[in-house]
């Protein structure tokens, strides 16, 4: 009798224990199903401990949940496209120039380095920076997501340094084009004056930008002076001529510039193009010209340098010292300028 009673009592206790475990597990499952993703993993761990044979599945769920949370945490907005214009001309190739010894580029004067392949073009602009025209040129280039080489005049950089900084900010290559656009091949200029024009031009660009430009130089009017060329070689400055002169400074309108460039380019097949961001008609012509280049299958090559140009400290200092700063006056405008008749 006692044995039977003991067996009955053990059965009741066992049933109660099983019911308690079942209820706790069921509650955990309901809680797990309703819980947000961020806390399901801990609940799954609790469920795994309570359910024999479920440890492997729970561990797998934990890994999947953790991976999902990590993936959500690392998702970032898609990167902005490098170019907003899907049909842009763009830049097909960037070349790095070693300027040691002063290499020359442009078949107008130099025949040694024929690095452009068929349909490749380098865009170059002289004589800036200048209000309205240079910003218009920059916009046209930016709209086509393409790059150029700029050869600014030193004096112009002191007049409009903020525009030259826009050129740099847009990612274009910047060289120099003398201090005052002097003809260095003129008999009126001696070797020392020519060197001063070169060095002062580079220092002016550096002063405007806040950093040294590329060691790229173009002679004004493409007037190459032998002594000056030798000097450029000692300073490891690359000399730029051109393959194709747009003669934009002679053009009566934008259409003439476009026709001149495309006619020559279709005949030659490639080349370094010389233009002027100083010229109004060039700024007007550029959007259409870039579209014509794209339609004609031409590709843009950007030229860069391995190392920035090392300006001469004494020239930098002299240029800063010689810069004329307007004298501020405490007098009001009305006491200086008065309208007496209108």
Enumerate the predicted regions with their spans.
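Active-site-proximal beta-strand/loop segments in catalytic clefts of secreted hydrolases
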Residues: 125-128, 151-155, 178-179, 218-222, ...
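Alpha-helical scaffold elements lining the catalytic groove of polysaccharide deacetylases
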Residues: 133, 182-209, 223-269, 282
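A short acidic, amphipathic alpha-helical/loop segment
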Residues: 136-137, 162-163, 228-231, 285-289
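Short low-complexity, flexible loop/linker segments enriched in glycine and/or proline
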Residues: 164-167, 189-192, 255-258, 315-319
């Amino acid at each position: 009798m006692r044995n039977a009673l003991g067996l009955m009592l053990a059965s009741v206790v066992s049933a109660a224990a099983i019911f308690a475990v079942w209820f706790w597990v069921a509650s955990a499952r309901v809680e797990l199903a309703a819980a947000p993703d961020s806390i399901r993993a801990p609940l799954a761990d609790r469920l795994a401990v309570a359910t024999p044979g479920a440890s492997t599945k729970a561990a797998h769920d934990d890994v999947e949940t953790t991976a999902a949370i990590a993936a959500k945490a690392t998702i970032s907005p898609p990167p902005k496209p490098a170019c907003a214009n899907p049909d842009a001309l763009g830049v097909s190739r960037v070349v790095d120039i070693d300027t040691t010894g002063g290499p020359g580029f442009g078949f107008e004067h130099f025949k040694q380095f024929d690095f452009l392949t068929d349909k490749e073009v380098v865009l170059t602009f002289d004589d800036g920076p200048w209000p309205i025209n240079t910003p218009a040129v920059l916009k046209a280039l930016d709209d086509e997501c393409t790059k150029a080489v700029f050869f600014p005049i030193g004096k112009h950089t002191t007049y409009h340094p903020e525009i030259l900084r826009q050129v740099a900010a847009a990612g274009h290559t910047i060289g120099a084009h003398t201090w005052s656009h002097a003809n260095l091949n003129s008999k009126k200029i001696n070797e020392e004056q020519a060197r001063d024009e070169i060095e002062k031009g580079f220092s002016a660009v550096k002063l405007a930008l806040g950093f040294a430009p590329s060691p790229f130089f173009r002679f004004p009017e493409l007037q190459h002076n032998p002594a000056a060329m030798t000097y450029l070689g000692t300073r490891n400055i690359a000399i730029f001529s051109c393959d194709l002169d747009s003669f934009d400074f002679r053009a009566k309108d934008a259409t003439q510039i476009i026709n001149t460039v495309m006619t020559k380019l279709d005949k030659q097949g490639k080349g370094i193009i010389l233009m002027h961001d100083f010229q109004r008609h060039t700024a007007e012509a550029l959007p259409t010209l870039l579209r014509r280049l794209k339609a004609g299958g031409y590709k843009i090559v950007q030229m860069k340098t391995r190392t920035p140009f090392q300006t001469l400290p004494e020239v930098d200092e002299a240029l800063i010292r010689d810069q004329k700063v307007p004298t501020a006056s405490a007098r009001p405008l009305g006491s200086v300028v008065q309208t007496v008749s209108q």
